[in-house]
């Protein structure tokens, strides 16, 4: 990453190095952020309890655990397996400041109804359509047991997982019932759980979007909301859910599109609920320490790190309330369900670059009061307003370097790279000039880049309303060619998820008892030429924010001052002073 200004790149003589040092710390050396990050309630990591120390260091604020009926009550309704998710594991998470969210899934073998699905645990439970307080409703009995057991420790409950993963006799399916069957499952869970713990929150199942997209079906969520709207009793019970969860992988731009599709689908029926991005990631294919058995897309470890920051910023701008990365750490048992290495932490406990990128998001994307997507063209800009502090995230969306000018809020800012390294930069004539490295994660099927180039995070003290007010009215404006491209701001979705080769989840949960929860469905890529979904995001579900601070996109080749070179010269200048050398000493060229 490069911080640049509009000066020529020729090195300054030592006679002016000291003046530069006196007015700016642009060339200050990069500093790596250290120490644990306070838990950020916005950001989660699936199964953080498998690496609790790393989770604490990363600032993970919440985690999800699968509470599998088939594993917790393997022998009947009076049985309980305390080793599946031991209480000390839960207690450690809570003590470390991480909220635990329960995922209720997998019908017990003794509770399945007829006909039994190829994956028996995907079968709807017996007695599902009986009243929730009827002893014959086995699902209600389980929900009552588990919510009672964890009351006061687990408050959020997700009801099942990825029911849209269905195609023929696919053994990866986790729900063999209809949309109507799922709605009944949700209603029973809602009524039962609220009776036990009125403060609990019931979440609609996470969906993948791409399974229906691939097979040309109407989106599962659209069909579900149609069913809900047809139930006259639903409004009186707040539609039987408190939040929606979704799972989006690999392609950064689809996060905006899919979240707005969900909003539009809800709003069409008069429903408005919070949205959680409960699974997201772009696992690397080039980690020599974890060569994947299957590869969805060629993703480098650096691109995975870029994805974490971009996905987090864009999800917040789209209106997501919380974001969770799948997942915290690779495990030896992952080979059956996770052919790709999703972990922020490797199996040997070393950190991937994505871990440090997660730290950046957890450290700087806090207390967000308002998030806007201000620029979406060759470059992207997301602004996160935290009241007295403003965080701006920028990245390049094309395959060539781009340089942008960002109107300043303060006289100086902290510039953060995806590695977590920071430096202080100074505004010049009321702007920061930033070089954005090119995007490299090319989608060979759809075209375009799935992930932008390495992002830059600009942190300023001051409200977003002060953007650009520091400009000196007498300053000479920087000359820009009249035909220079200029990024235009937008706060509306500009693209519908395109029906091409997209990650298709292969849901293959196992039923092997284990003291920790096993991963949920993970995506793999399958080429498809299916048509674009007929339901698309509309402006009715977009933020009403007025775009702010559209940066000028400078033409390629604009001279830029390399920060590392500046730091070298600054250090050399200080050395000269300390050595008592004359100011007019002949300039030496830096080592190459």
Where in the sequence are the language-model features?
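C-terminal beta-strand-rich structural cap/linker in extracellular carbohydrate-active enzymes
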Residues: 426-473
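Substrate-binding cleft and catalytic face of glycoside hydrolase catalytic domains
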Residues: 58-78, 82-240
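Noncatalytic carbohydrate-binding groove/subsite architecture in carbohydrate-active enzymes
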Residues: 179-312, 318
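Carbohydrate-binding surface patches
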Residues: 374-413, 417-420, 461
């Amino acid at each position: 990453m490069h911080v640049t200004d509009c000066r020529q790149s020729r090195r300054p003589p030592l006679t002016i190095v000291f003046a530069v040092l006196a007015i700016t710390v642009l060339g200050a050396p990069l500093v790596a952020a250290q120490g644990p990050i306070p838990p950020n309630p916005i950001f989660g990591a699936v199964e953080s309890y498998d690496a609790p120390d790393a989770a604490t260091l990363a600032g993970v604020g919440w985690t999800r655990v699968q509470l599998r009926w088939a594993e917790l009550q393997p022998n009947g309704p009076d049985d309980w397996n305390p080793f599946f998710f031991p209480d000390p594991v839960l207690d450690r998470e809570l003590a470390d400041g991480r909220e635990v969210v329960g995922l209720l899934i997998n019908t017990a073998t003794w509770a399945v109804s007829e006909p039994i699905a190829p994956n028996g645990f995907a079968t709807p439970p017996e007695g599902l359509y009986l009243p929730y307080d009827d002893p014959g409703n086995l699902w209600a009995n389980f929900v009552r047991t588990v919510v009672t057991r964890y009351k006061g420790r687990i408050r959020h409950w997700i009801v099942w997982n990825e029911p849209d993963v269905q195609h023929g006799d696919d053994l990866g399916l986790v729900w063999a019932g209809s949309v109507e069957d799922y709605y009944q499952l949700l209603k029973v869970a809602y009524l039962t759980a609220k009776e036990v713990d009125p403060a609990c929150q019931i979440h609609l199942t996470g969906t993948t979007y791409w399974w229906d997209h691939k097979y040309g079906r109407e989106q599962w969520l659209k069909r579900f909301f149609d069913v809900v709207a047809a139930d006259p009793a639903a409004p009186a019970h707040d539609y039987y859910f408190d939040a929606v969860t979704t799972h989006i992988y690999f392609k950064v731009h689809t996060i905006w599109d899919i979240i707005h599709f969900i909003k539009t689908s809800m709003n069409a029926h008069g429903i408005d609920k919070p949205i959680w991005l409960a699974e997201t990631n772009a696992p690397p294919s080039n980690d020599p320490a974890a060569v994947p058995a299957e590869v969805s897309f060629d993703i480098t470890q650096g691109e995975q790190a870029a994805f974490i920051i971009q996905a987090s910023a864009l999800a917040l701008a789209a209106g997501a309330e919380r974001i969770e990365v799948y997942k915290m750490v690779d495990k030896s048992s992952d080979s059956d369900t996770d052919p790709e290495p999703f972990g922020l932490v490797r199996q040997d406990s070393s950190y991937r670059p994505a871990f440090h990128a997660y730290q950046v998001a957890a450290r700087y994307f806090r207390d967000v009061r308002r998030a806007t997507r201000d620029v979406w063209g060759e470059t992207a800009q997301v602004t996160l307003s935290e009241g007295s502090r403003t965080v701006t995230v920028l990245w390049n969306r094309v395959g060539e370097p781009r340089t942008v000018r960002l109107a300043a809020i303060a006289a100086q800012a902290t510039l953060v790279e995806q590695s977590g390294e920071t430096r202080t930069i100074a505004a010049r004539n009321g702007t920061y000039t930033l070089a954005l490295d090119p995007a490299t994660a090319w989608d060979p099927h759809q075209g375009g880049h799935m992930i932008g180039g390495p992002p830059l995070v600009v942190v300023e003290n001051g409200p977003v309303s002060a953007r650009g007010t520091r400009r000196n009215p007498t300053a000479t404006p920087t000359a820009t060619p009249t035909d220079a491209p200029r990024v235009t701001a937008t706060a509306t979705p500009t693209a519908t998820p395109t029906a091409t080769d997209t990650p298709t989840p292969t849901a293959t949960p196992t039923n092997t008892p284990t003291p920790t929860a096993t991963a949920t469905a993970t995506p793999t890529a399958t080429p498809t030429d299916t048509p674009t979904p007929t339901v698309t995001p509309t402006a009715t579900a977009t933020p009403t924010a007025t775009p702010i601070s559209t940066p000028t996109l400078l033409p390629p080749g604009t001279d830029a001052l390399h920060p590392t070179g500046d730091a070298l010269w600054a250090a050399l200048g200080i050395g000269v002073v300390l050595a008592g050398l004359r100011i007019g000493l002949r300039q030496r060229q830096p080592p190459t």
